[in-house]
């Protein structure tokens, strides 16, 4: 990389103290939303992608003539007028100060000083929730609401346009006629019901009083229960109005009228974007995938650890700190017509009346976050429960996952800050923490936890343990005596190496095809161990235990085969390799994969005998994709199959769009998720009957037949 020691345009730079680059939530291109190669203009607040992505930063220079820009992640400075990277700073040392501030924001370490004592506006913050304060949260909550409202308005306008066009067509006119006839039928049913009620009331009034006062009192109390609306009988105007509708027709129309009153979801459940809070695309992609795995989502929609967590924590620690109630950490709906603006929001014991739980016709959506909770009160299971409730409520087009990010920072310190992270590492750490939390749940004051709750926790733990859990058969064969030694090893994902032809630098590597089946075959192929290094039990069996003779070492070969298939198969493609001592580069070749994967060729013989052929078939459920060329930079998106709408969705942080299977198969996959079509016990549903029967949709009253999606 060529650099200039001195650039005259840097000397003319005057950087504002409240530059937008200090907000991690703006570390993405304003045009294409990518977080790869992000350049911030140092003359204004514009942030865009570099010339090797979509050239939006270059276009901004051509339109505004602002020459100097800074790469947010690598912190290089580039001058477009000089067309070169620069090293010098201006007289006030703004670039050095800006780099120090960016490093502090990424690491969340604000113990930094400058020689002159001059600091930027945000330099004095010392809390690790730097950009999670109330002002920022409130601003983003309003933006989320406005985004959802704007999307909803656009959908309504588009629906009106298509409805007008549809009404002019022959099919539309026929539909209008049917609806008109249905209205008349409903009106006749209502009128007939009112007439019957009036007749019943008239008959009750003409009945003679009973001799027994007790029976007379009972009769009076019985008549009070029926309070019909008195409507004067009208003479039928035509024979058609005299027609009596049958009872079955009454029931059918009554059901139709009841169902028509149900609220349709604003968006298709699950089609909710997650705002990028500052290089958090790795977290957003993983959360989108986990929420679209049916068995995983249903478990955490059912389980909420917040209720007993506060009880056990307060009883165990006796801390003066009061754990925030569930309404302090979940998405709620507050009354929109509330006249007293200074009054506190109403408290609800559960999510049934909140954003995630039900349908409130006159409520305003609001996101409330925990305030500086201690780490022992934080529950990742509760945060997943809350977030999944919101994402699958059908009410939000965009959500800012503040609480989830805050919990990750506290419970997984390696991901604290706004630095770019690896999605595979985050997924492993997140699942490990969730499993540990569920395992330790029942041991903390079990007497205070209801039996039903402990049973539910045990069921969810069983699902979490088994959903990704499989077993490998490691078989070592001695080449001297042909003795085989078998070892069973657990696995939660399969890390697949690329073939040898992709491990070296070459110009024609990307043009050579590669498929995931080839990588699976490489994973399960027989591998020769180098030299005589294997201690064979059979070859050393004749040697006495305390004999002075040396141990016999032989040559051997090793093979890995799958002996127990997981319910959800995770395939991690090892795209990053070491190049030199401290550099990791990416293997950017496209890996072909299919919608249906047959795992039978990669299983051991015992599994082939014990399982039915249907158990080896897997369906593609999700794909995590990495955009970029390096390990420490890039952008993550995810392709997820939405079971509610029956379509594939491309999840790019806040932007979600419908896509086809062909588009999914063209993705540069990093992690593949396949769901077993039929489990070993022969069931197609992976969810336990106890959880499946008791689970509820987060928006029970929503009509999920609507297939509208974000455009």
From Swiss-Prot:
Q: What is this protein called?
A: Ubiquitin carboxyl-terminal hydrolase 44
Positions contributing to Zn(2+) 1 binding? 7, 9, 79, 82
The entry's function note states: Deubiquitinase that plays a key regulatory role in the spindle assembly checkpoint or mitotic checkpoint by preventing premature anaphase onset. Acts by specifically mediating deubiquitination of CDC20, a negative regulator of the anaphase promoting complex/cyclosome (APC/C). Deubiquitination of CDC20 leads to stabilize the MAD2L1-CDC20-APC/C ternary complex (also named mitotic checkpoint complex), thereby preventing premature activation of the APC/C. Promotes association of MAD2L1 with CDC20 and reinforces the spindle assembly checkpoint.
As for PTM, the annotation reads: Dephosphorylated by CTDP1.
* Chemical reaction(s) catalysed: Thiol-dependent hydrolysis of ester, thioester, amide, peptide and isopeptide bonds formed by the C-terminal Gly of ubiquitin (a 76-residue protein attached to proteins as an intracellular targeting signal)
What keyword terms does UniProt attach to this protein?
Cell cycle, Cell division, Cytoplasm, Hydrolase, Immunity, Innate immunity, Metal-binding, Mitosis, Nucleus, Protease, Thiol protease, Ubl conjugation, Ubl conjugation pathway, Zinc, Zinc-finger
Zinc-finger ranges (UBP-type): 5-102
Q: Where does Zn(2+) 2 bind?
A: 29, 32, 49, 56
GO MF annotations for this entry?
cysteine-type deubiquitinase activity; zinc ion binding
Compositional bias per record (Basic and acidic residues), positions renumbered to this chain: 240-261
Question: What family does this belong to?
Answer: Belongs to the peptidase C19 family. USP44 subfamily.
Q: May I have one GO cellular component term?
A: cytoplasm
**Matching PANTHER family:** UBIQUITIN CARBOXYL-TERMINAL HYDROLASE, UBIQUITIN CARBOXYL-TERMINAL HYDROLASE 44
Q: What class of enzyme is it?
A: hydrolase
Which species is this record about?
A: Ailuropoda melanoleuca (Giant panda)
Q: Where are the transmembrane segments?
A: none
Q: Which GO terms describe its biological process?
A: antiviral innate immune response; cell division; chromosome segregation; negative regulation of mitotic metaphase/anaphase transition; negative regulation of ubiquitin protein ligase activity; proteasome-mediated ubiquitin-dependent protein catabolic process; protein deubiquitination; regulation of mitotic cell cycle spindle assembly checkpoint
